[in-house]
UniProtKB/Swiss-Prot annotation:
Keywords: Metal-binding, Nucleus, Zinc, Zinc-finger. A zinc finger (SWIM-type) spans 525-561. One of its GO terms (biological process) is regulation of DNA-templated transcription. This is Protein FAR1-RELATED SEQUENCE 3. It comes from Arabidopsis thaliana (Mouse-ear cress). Putative transcription activator involved in regulating light control of development.
Length: 851
């Protein structure tokens, strides 16, 4: 069953997308100067084509002429070729009579012709500038009809945000054109999920039944059709309680290029990683719909609003954010603006290659408002762009998107592109992703996030950082912050050795310092320091923006003998203890059902009931809270007694799996979704060799279907054992039934007990059932080997072997931490292969049954 979005487009009146029709007010004429092969500017500063001008592609030329026509006050179109030529293209004024129904007297001859010369360059061979009709004045440009960015039936997208098919909006900082376009789209375009609305609700109900912390809400329109949807699972909601100070609404997937118009709410965790707070399917893009969405998000997050919010510049989103989050600092995603600039400024970048670099530096590397204003004016004047409409609209809205204007607010922006350029679903979702496939990839992305966060937690705890200074402050920070955040703090601290701080004012309690790099004393920063409160403020505002102290404040701390970080400069959200909840151990019971996921869900259900009872009165609340804290202390004692727990290996998550879009175990897939529209990647590292003998013929030993256990034998009883040298494997089918696929494992062990030492092979088979407990036990062993480095683990495999009298055989060997890590990666990959094959076989049999 193929799932798609249905668009019901009605007539759009004057705003209907078409190839013809322009606003025709006052006339505008000028002489054509063709003495510049790279393009010239006319008398009002608009870059125009000229004969001999070169482009790298046809699309690049079209983008240039589109922008030129818009700046001049007319719209253009691609003239279809009746002779089938692929080496010549003509872009003409929309008032041209060629191939149209216009009367000859109304025809306009303005055009540009490009020809393909060689294999790479398109060259302008003809340019007609004069029009036979009036052109739109500057204050009427926003009334020009939107242009199609498709050539005939060619539907290829050549640049993000450029193509504007019917029913789709693209980013524009021009409030007038944006508002007019959005109004028509919102009024006349209706998007629905169609027949999969029922499946979606059933999926949400199943998720909520399994996990009471799962939240979802649906907005209905006047026809009782699903209008917008929001959902968030318990892990996302818990993450918001710790890291919900800054939120980004990523709306790049709303456009019609994507089959699923979803928008994730994302944030940043204590490792600087992207995390998910919730997701929305946006079918109606009106003001009221976004108000509903933000209010629903706030309800799901227990009415805790964010400190800062990042969105696109959509008018409806701006209105909704102002109403629902009045206290939050709201900014526009600068990366959306920069992406749009690739289209709007294509003609300028072609004519002046250095322009793009200078503008980028102006936006991203200026540190004060005055510096930005000066740099912007310099760039605009240098390239004579004072009349460029789009750049002027950008400048008018500068306080909403240029980073320097909101450095006084917290955005958790520790790293340059963090929270802006990327997306939580990068690498998972593309333009062909359907709704059933989306939810499977959504779960895969969630599991990947969970695993990456745990890996970062373990790295922080188990691997001590290398200190670069004798500073007590560095040692303090190393024990407080996560590894990633400490790395940033350490970078700032080391830079203090290259900075000087000179006191320029002192009133007894507050001192003002001038801090500068000794190699660049002309660029200085002002730091004010209050001695009684031990608070410092720097003109760079790095701490206010990111929560990490800058090198300038740290330099002042050095000269004033502040040797450790004051408590108010240690943000809990950046520390290794940012998440207050105690993690549970991950030992797996023999039946395989008492996993961390089941225990977690059960505790969530009990905790919610407990919270509902405890919130009735203040007395009940105090008793409940006291018991929770007391219980937390007891759990901590138990956890310390049994040692660190192994990282959870959730269903569907593979250790070290590198491909994001491949789907792992079948239990990650909602059974209510059909699968015939999904392409699953097939690959096997062992496919290059000859086909191995069938497993049924090999009669290899099988891994016993029981979990592995730790052997606490005293170290002094240890004897020399074989060491693991290599692991190879292959895939075979035992039968045609689902799950009949097994992996044949070949371990090569080097036995030092023999003289001379020799290799020995151990071969056995694993199914997806027996592989899982083995993999989890190995992951636990790997953590135990994390320190000290000279420890080894002794592995004892018990195999079911029909060739022995007892029906069993044992093999014992030892592994180091690095060897076990390589073994883990191979086993995780094998698990993924077994899962993929199982899904394919199930799908194939289902198709046969349908036939």
């Amino acid at each position: 069953m193929d799932v798609h979005l249905v668009e019901e487009n009605v007539s759009m009146g004057n705003h209907e997308i078409g190839d013809e029709g322009d606003v025709e007010p006052s006339d505008c004429s000028g002489q054509n100067n063709m003495d510049n092969s790279l393009g010239v500017q006319d008398e009002i500063g608009i870059a125009e084509p000229c004969v001999g001008m070169e482009f790298n592609s046809e699309k690049e030329a079209k983008s240039f002429y589109d922008e030129y026509s818009r700046q001049l006050g007319f719209t253009s179109k691609l003239l279809p070729r009746t002779d089938g030529s692929v080496s010549v293209r003509e872009f003409v004024c929309s008032s041209s009579s060629k191939r149209s129904k216009r009367r000859l007297s109304e025809s306009c001859d303005a055009m540009v012709r490009i020809e393909l010369q060689g294999h790479e360059k398109w060259v302008v061979t003809k340019f007609v500038k004069e029009h036979t009709h009036g052109l739109a004045s500057s204050n009427m440009l926003h009334c020009l009809r939107p242009r199609r960015h498709f050539a005939n039936s060619e539907k290829s997208s050549y640049q993000e945000g450029v193509n504007v098919p019917s029913g789709m909006m693209y980013v524009s900082m021009d409030a007038n054109s944006r508002g007019a376009r959005n109004a028509s789209m919102a009024t006349n375009t209706k998007r629905t999920i169609g027949r999969d609305a029922h499946n979606l609700l059933e999926y949400f109900k199943r998720m909520q039944a399994e996990n009471p912390g799962f939240f979802y809400a649906v907005q209905l329109d006047e026809d009782n059709q699903m209008s917008n949807v929001f959902w968030a699972d318990s892990r996302s909601r818990v993450a918001y309680t710790h890291f919900g100070d800054t939120v980004t609404l990523d709306t790049r997937y709303r456009c019609n290029q994507f089959r699923v118009p979803f928008a994730p709410f994302t944030g940043v965790n204590h490792h600087g990683q992207a995390i998910l707070f919730g997701c929305a399917l946006i079918l109606d893009e009106s003001d009221t719909s976004f108000i509903w969405l933000f209010k629903t998000f706030l309800t799901a997050m227990r009415d805790q609003p964010p400190v800062s919010l990042v969105t696109d510049q959509d008018r409806a989103i701006q209105i909704a954010a102002g109403q629902v989050f009045p206290g939050a600092r709201h900014c526009i995603n600068k990366w959306d603006v920069l992406r749009e600039g690739q289209e709007k400024l294509a003609h300028v970048c072609l004519a002046y290659p250095s322009f793009q670099v200078e503008l980028y530096n102006c936006i991203n590397f200026t540190e004060t408002i005055e510096e930005f204003e000066s740099s912007w004016s310099s760039v605009i004047d240098k390239y004579d762009l004072g009349r460029h409409e789009w750049l002027n609209s950008l400048y008018n809205a500068r306080a909403q998107w240029v980073p320097v204007y909101f450095r006084d607010s917290f955005f958790a922006a520790v790293f340059p592109s963090q929270g802006y350029s990327g997306s939580f679903f990068d690498g998972y979702v593309n333009q062909q992703t359907t709704l059933p496939m989306f939810f499977r990839l959504y779960e895969r992305a969630m599991e990947s996030w969970f695993e990456m966060e745990i890996e970062a937690d373990l790295d922080t705890v188990n691997t001590p950082p290398v200190l670069k200074t004798p500073s007590p402050m560095e040692n303090q920070a190393a024990n407080l912050f996560t590894r990633k955040i400490f790395g940033k703090f350490q970078e700032e601290l080391v830079e203090t050795f290259a900075h000087t701080a000179n006191r320029i004012e002192d009133d007894g309690t507050t001192s003002t310092f001038r801090v500068a790099n000794f190699e660049n004393d002309n660029k200085a920063y002002i730091v004010t320091f209050c001695y009684p409160e031990m608070r410092a403020n720097c003109s760079c505002q790095m701490f206010e923006h990111s929560g990490i102290l800058c090198r300038h404040v740290l330099t002042v701390f050095t000269v004033t003998n502040i040797l450790t970080l004051p408590p108010h400069y240690i943000l809990r959200r950046w520390t290794r203890n940012a998440k207050s909840m105690v993690e549970l151990d991950e030992h797996v019971s023999e039946n395989g059902h008492d996993s961390s996921i089941h225990r977690y869900n059960h505790l969530c259900r009990e905790a919610i009931k407990y919270a509902e009872e405890g919130a009735i009165t203040a007395e009940a609340y105090n008793i409940a809270l006291g018991q929770l804290r007391e219980g937390g202390k007891k759990v901590s004692v138990v956890r310390k007694r049994i040692g660190r727990a192994a990282p959870p290996s959730s269903h569907g998550g593979g250790i070290g799996s590198g491909d994001k879009t491949s789907l792992s175990a079948a239990d990650t897939t909602p059974l209510l979704w059909p699968r015939q529209d999904e392409m699953i990647r097939r690959f096997n590292l062992n496919d290059g060799g000859a086909r191995a003998q069938s497993v049924s013929d090999l009669n290899l030993p099988r891994m016993a279907p029981v979990s592995l256990h730790r052997d606490d034998t005293a170290p002094e009883n240890m004897v020399a054992l074989p060491c693991l040298k290599s692991l190879t494997w292959g895939m075979e089918s035992k039968n045609t039934m689902p799950g009949g696929r097994v992996a044949v494992i070949n371990l090569k062990l080097h036995d030092y007990r023999k003289f001379p030492s020799a290799d020995m092979d151990v071969k056995f088979q694993l199914s997806s059932v027996t592989l899982e407990p083995m993999l989890r036990s190995m992951a636990y062993i790997s953590e135990q080997l994390s320190s000290p480095a000279n420890r080894v683990a002794v592995i004892n495999l018990k195999l079911q072997d029909t060739e022995t009298t007892t029906g069993e055989s044992e093999v014992k060997f030892q592994v180091s931490r690095d060897t076990l890590g390589a073994m883990l990666r191979s086993m995780a990959y094998i698990r993924e292969q077994l899962s993929i094959v199982g899904e394919l076989q199930t799908e194939s049999q289902a198709k046969k049954q349908r036939k």
